[in-house]
Amino acid sequence: MDFLIVLKALMMGLVEGFTEFLPISSTGHLIVFGNLIGFHSNHKVFEIAIQLGAVLAVVFEYRQRFSNVLHGVGKDRKANRFVLNLAIAFIPAAVMGLLFDKQIKEYLFNPLSVAVMLVLGGFFILWVEKRQSRAEPKIADVDALRPIDALMIGVAQVFALVPGTSRSGSTVMGGMFWGIERKTATEFSFFLAVPMMVAATAYDVLKHYRFFTLHDVGLILIGFIAAFVSGLVAVKALLKFVSKKNYIPFAYYRIVFGIVIIILWLSGWISWE
């Protein structure tokens, strides 16, 4: 394999892992970064691999929690409620995604939509953070979440179907808006990423498996490992960060990044193929 291509695959995996769980849109970063470094591998298959690497980072980080839940389902009330909440939160975006996947990719997968959603999302984060600073959150533990809380987070996740919104951003801010404490909303967003991204990966595999070739295996493995490692670092770092600080820095970053996308697009530095 060409060293430069390997380096680019490594960089793309790192970008996916670092941005997937931050409220800054991994999709926007992958497209912009991919264009800037000229990475043109078997795009969809590679994207599936690095997304899977990122989600497995969450599974690894919370392996004890998931193990306890799996062993406790049907026997333990706490485990049953956890699974029920994940299922409830999963359904809205899954249904809407299946119904409108084609339309979303046809009409909203463009630089302007991504940039606008990044900027709007940034202002929404600022508003939600200001709102929560004025009132004590009602829920401060994932195990205290009720089905209605999970449903509200699931409804918020629907907005993440629009590129540039950010799945983690919509679920965390949706939870905080509903009165869930910042770190609790962040943890539940991590947990919800597992069924959501596994389902999305399975769906994409069924649609694009015929494009997979043995020639791509090396690059896919490199991207997968890079996304797993960087995703693990991002999850640990974000939890530590939100334990002491808020999401306001990410809000300003989104606003600036959205403007940068417009500038790069208008100047011809990035395309959307």
From Swiss-Prot:
- Highest taxon in the source lineage: Bacteria
Q: Name one GO cellular component term.
A: plasma membrane
Q: Which Pfam family would be a valid example here? A: BacA
Q: Locate the transmembrane regions by residue number.
A: 13-35, 45-62, 82-102, 108-128, 186-206, 219-239, 250-270
Please name the GO terms that the record assigns under molecular function.
undecaprenyl-diphosphatase activity
Catalysed reaction equations from the record: di-trans,octa-cis-undecaprenyl diphosphate + H2O = di-trans,octa-cis-undecaprenyl phosphate + phosphate + H(+)
Q: What UniProt keywords are attached to this protein's entry?
A: Antibiotic resistance, Cell inner membrane, Cell membrane, Cell shape, Cell wall biogenesis/degradation, Hydrolase, Membrane, Peptidoglycan synthesis, Transmembrane, Transmembrane helix
Q: Which GO terms describe its biological process?
A: cell wall organization; peptidoglycan biosynthetic process; regulation of cell shape; response to antibiotic
- How does this protein lie in the membrane? Multi-pass membrane protein
The record's subcellular location field reads: Cell inner membrane
EC number(s) per entry: 3.6.1.27
| HAMAP family per UniProt | Undec_diphosphatase
The similarity comment for this entry is: Belongs to the UppP family.
Q: What is the role of the protein in this entry?
A: Catalyzes the dephosphorylation of undecaprenyl diphosphate (UPP). Confers resistance to bacitracin.
Q: What else is known?
A: Bacitracin is thought to be involved in the inhibition of peptidoglycan synthesis by sequestering undecaprenyl diphosphate, thereby reducing the pool of lipid carrier available.
How is this protein named in the record?
Answer: Undecaprenyl-diphosphatase
